[in-house]
Each structure stands twice: as C-alpha cells, then as structure tokens.
Amino acid sequence: MSHSTPFKIDVSSRILRLPPYLFGRINKMKYEKRVAGVDIIDLGMGNPTDPTPDSVVAKLTEAARDPRNHRYSVSNGIVGLRREVAEKYRRQYGVTLDPESEVIATIGSKEGFSHLCLALLGPGDTIVVGDPAFPIHIYAPAMAGANVIRVPLGNDQAFLDRIERTIDGLYPPPKLLILNYPHNPTAMTITADFWDRAIALCRRRNIMIVSDFAYGEVCFDGYQAPSFLAAEGAKEVGVEFTTMSKSYNMAGWRCGFCCGNAEMIKALATIKGYYDYGMFAPIQIASVIAMREHSEFPPEQSRLYQHRRNVVCRGLDKIGWTYDKPLASMFVWAKINPEHLKGQDTIDFCLRMMDEAAVALAPGKAFGDHGEGYVRIALVENDQRLRQAMANLDRALNPRQPRPRRAKAATA
C-alpha cells in the first residue's frame, strides 16, 4: 500500500528555537577522521582521561554486588551523600548547609542545571549570562522557554555595571543571573569580593543567582577559587552547582550537586521527582568515599593540570598565539594569530587544524560571538601528546624553510 503524502514529524517549538549547535561539524569531522584511522589528538572537550581513585572504583564494585542497590534510588540523592556534600562545604569553605533542604544530588551538574531552568523559568522570562558562555547556560534557559540576554564577559565591577545597565533596559526585569567562575571556556577567575558585589546587585534587583562552580577545585599557583555560598547573603538569593567530574576524574559517572537556597532546591526536587529516580545508588556510595577519604586527590590532580598548562603555554609561545595564563580550570583560552586564521572564522579554522595538524580544538565562536578569534584548549592529554599537538599546530601554521646544505669543499 503506497501513500502519496509523506508522514511528517512535527517537533515542538522548544526544539526549533534552540540556537545552532556549532560543535556539530567539529564532532562529525573528528568521528570521520578516527574511522579512517587518523590519530586525532583531542583537546576540544573537557573530558578527563586520568583515572578515578582506585578505592572509589573498588567501592563502586562492592556496592554494585549488593542486590539492594539495584532498586530505584531517590531523586534528591541518598542522605549519606547529601550529608557528605554539606560536610565538604563546611570543611572547605566554612559554609553551613542543611543536607535535607539545602543540598540535592543531580545526575551531573548539566542535568541539574537544565531541570532547575525548567523549575524556575518559562515563556516570557529572561536570564542574563556572560558571553562567551558554556553552551548549556544558553541552551537550558532557551529550552525552558526563556529569553537569553548575553553581556560581554568580565570578572570585575565593570562587568557588574554592564549587567546593571542591561537590566535597566529590560522589562520585565530578568529572573536569573548565571555566573560561572572559574570560567568555562575562558578560565577567567574572580576574587571573593566579586560575589559580595554580585549578591548586592541581585538583592537590589530581586534577581536569583546560579553559580556554576564545576572547576572550583582545579586551581593553580596558590590560587583558591571562592565559593559563591561562602559570601554573606548568598543563600538568600541563589544556588551553586558542583560536580565530581573534574575534581575526582568521574566525568562519566554523572554525579553532581546543587546547594543553597532552600526554595530553589525544593523547586528542583519537585521537577526531578517527576523526571527521574536519582542516580544509580553505587555511584552515590562511591562518591561519598571519594569526598570522605580522598581530600588530597583534587590538589594532586590540580598540580597535574598545572604542569600540563605550562606545557601548552610554552607551545603557544612558539606558535605565536597570545593568552592569559590561567589560574584555574582545565583549559587554556588562546587568541589565534590573525595571520593564521586566513580570513576564516574559528569553526572553519578548527576544521582546518584537524585536517592539517590532526588536532581537535574547541572554536571560540561555539561559546558566543565574543569568543570569535579564540580557541579553547583542554588539558586532558598527557605531556607527550600535548607536546605533539603543539608541534603539529606549529608545523601546520608556521612552515619553515629547510636549511640549505653546505656545499662540500672541492678536492683535487
């Protein structure tokens, strides 16, 4: 039986209003190159390659053998995990949290952030975020139906002044300000007084704050990233997301947390209660062990990233790109020499580098208009691979003429 009219799938306006996913072309070429047998050095994704602590993996295995742990968990996280998160905040940042009402476990911070946007935002609402920005900070509010206003990124009073001037021109005023320090993709950092000023601004304007603190424990050269929740009045106006992904090399485990304002946590818990039954219990149990028994691990991992940062920065000096040496995160944000771009935008440039240098980079344009001209370099490979990547880029961008051979002296 034939049908003259093809069946049409009509997707929702929620999908249609999403901005283009600019990493798509990069990921497609990376896949095709690898299928063809090309050894691509992937510095484009912040995906840790170092191992999780052995005892954490052992605890996961042990817990997975207990049939009781194969049942549904609870959507807000087991009580032992929430208590451990609260204890870590007390120990590390001097913050007091009620594990029952001010802490919730999420299936990675991206899931938690996305569901929080559904809980707080809807059509007609507006959020403000810096540009460039981690893509989910744009996509999740858009999927919730909210308008996204981007303000050129900064880490000082001038940035907050730009935000306030932007708010003055908006009606109704925005509901949410999204802040992310140490920043992804730029690795920009702040001092503690930034949070005091941001909280004062948001209290004046009745705007909620969401702090993405995913890289809070990945710090270099003695720098210590300040937690939003350590600032006076923080819990009155907002929440903070953290994750096990970067500090303990548990990215694929998908274990994150949201802490802070009890009403915002309750709204997130309500949404999660409809959407999921929480993460696999053995992952939660192993995460408790990671935080309780491995307080030395995040600083050790940070020292490793600091060393890799130095390797990459030396390579960039040779290539001829500029950068601000990062004090935190697992990225270097580098400005491409305009001569190397050859008139291309950063997406086409990164495609060319994958072709000519077998190196995958994250194009700055994928993070926003103010990222154009930059690339994000992830410190996820070992020293040898990082040096090779820098050498490959240098050869592709700065071809050097071979030295002429000396003529041999004539003999009689």
For the regions a language model picked out, list residue spans one by one.
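Conserved N-terminal alpha-helix of the aminotransferase class I/II PLP-enzyme fold
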Residues: Y72-I107
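PLP-dependent class I/II
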Residues: M1-V11, I15-Y21, I26, Y31-I41, ...
